[in-house]
Amino acid sequence: MFVSRFTSVTALTLLVLAGCAPPRIAALPGTAAPAQQLPRGTLPEGRRKVVFQWELKDGDMISRGDGVARIASPDSVRLDFFLGGGFGSGAAVLIGDSLQVPGPEMGRRLVPPRALLWAALGRFDVPAERDTVVRVDAGVLRADIGAPVHWRATFRGDTLSRLERVDGGRLQEWVERSADLKVRYRNEAARRTLSLVIQSSDVVASFDPSIWRL
């Protein structure tokens, strides 16, 4: 009886853990294409100020607020997040490979890792890998980068629309940019989702140099 009960509990535990595991990635659809066809995925030239609303779902907690991104091509961005009701704020600066997110834990939960943050802005910048597989399906180009796969990128035309971080054949984190001015970041293991809705995007002449220091 004890062995049977122990076996049942163990099986149930394994099922629960399997249900919590990040999803496995499927094989890329479409026809093979040369890796040289992979778009560059760069930021638009110049400087832009982007205003957005954000919502963070982290377990049972939901937070909302407003934010501003100050973007300077080719490789600099400052993000400021303001919690609804004026109850807090956070900031991050990403310049090239250097990401600074000082302050409380909430700020770090609002900011994806470096490569995914760049992807949220439309810039394709992942660590170099020896193996890249590119396939095209119905005009959509997808690329698996690394062997085993570490990154999966999706392009519509020359525009980066989705970037996924993969580990052990499972989807760990992803960022998706849609045509309706929405951006979503999802951490599958942490069950955390950040959604942005862009309110405005304006070209500006310059930024005060002090914004790059936190």
Q: What residue ranges belong to the model's regions?
A:
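Sec-dependent bacterial lipoprotein signal peptides
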Residues: 1-20
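N-terminal leader/targeting segments and the immediate start of mature chains
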Residues: 20-76, 86, 104-106, 129-132, ...
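Extended lipid/amphipathic-ligand handling interfaces
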Residues: 67-71, 92-98, 173-177
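A mature extracytoplasmic/lumenal domain signature
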Residues: 81-85, 94-98, 103-105, 167, ...
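Local beta-strand/beta-hairpin segments that build beta-sheet-rich folds
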Residues: 87-91, 150
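Acidic/charged, solvent-exposed loop-and-adjacent secondary-structure segments enriched in E/D, K/R, S/T
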Residues: 99-131
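Gly/Pro-enriched, hydrophobic low-complexity segments
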Residues: 134-214
